[in-house]
Swiss-Prot record:
It comes from the Eukaryota. Residues 1-39 form a transit peptide. Its main location: plastid. The keyword Transit peptide applies. It comes from Arabidopsis thaliana. Residues 100-147 are stromal. This is Protein COFACTOR ASSEMBLY OF COMPLEX C SUBUNIT B CCB3, chloroplastic.
Length: 174
């Protein structure tokens, strides 16, 4: 089987046997056939595979290599350290964004005075950039809500009970 790959997408003539027959009687004008070629995405350049078994072995070795690469740089000790830093940081920013949501209800608050500046100063540089992308809707600033959602999502995905860093930190070292 000959496979031609171009920038991570391979066009394989051998895959044409798995394709359904076209209901149209007129041929496809691009390749003069009655059916379209099947495109399969791959992560490697495969010169020639004599059998499908070789192709399956190559694909399995690629997926195993990608799995090993993604977990190679992060050992359980580093994951525990990252949890210790990211967990409180994400919780603190989540709380600050909740305060900013409440502060957005009162636009005349003196944000440069003591109690309000604690929530205003760390979050405003992030919110200014986000306001350029998401303008206020009907006079209501929605950017603190967007950032609270993003911070909550990251917290759950990374350091939640089934988070990625928690799972890596519980991994047994061989």
């Amino acid at each position: 089987m000959t496979t031609v790959t171009t920038s991570f997408v391979s066009f394989s003539p051998a895959l044409m046997i798995f394709q359904k027959k076209s209901r149209r009687s007129s041929p496809n004008f691009r390749n003069r056939s009655t059916s379209l070629p099947i495109v399969s995405a791959t992560l490697s350049h495969i010169e020639e595979a004599a059998t499908t078994t070789n192709l399956i072995r190559q694909t399995n070795s690629i997926s195993e290599s990608l799995r090993n690469i993604s977990l190679a740089d992060l050992d359980p000790g580093t994951a525990k350290l990252a949890i210790g830093i990211l967990g409180p940081a994400l919780s603190a920013f989540g709380f600050l964004f909740i305060l900013r949501i409440v502060m957005s209800w009162y636009p005349k608050l003196p944000v440069d005075k003591f109690p309000y500046v604690l929530a205003y100063a760390p979050t405003e540089p992030i919110l200014v950039q986000t306001r350029k992308v998401i303008p206020p809707l009907a006079g209501v600033d929605v950017t603190p809500v967007v950032w609270f959602g993003l911070v909550s999502f990251l917290s759950e995905i990374l350091v939640g009970p089934q988070g990625l860093l928690v799972l890596v930190s519980q991994q047994q070292v061989n």
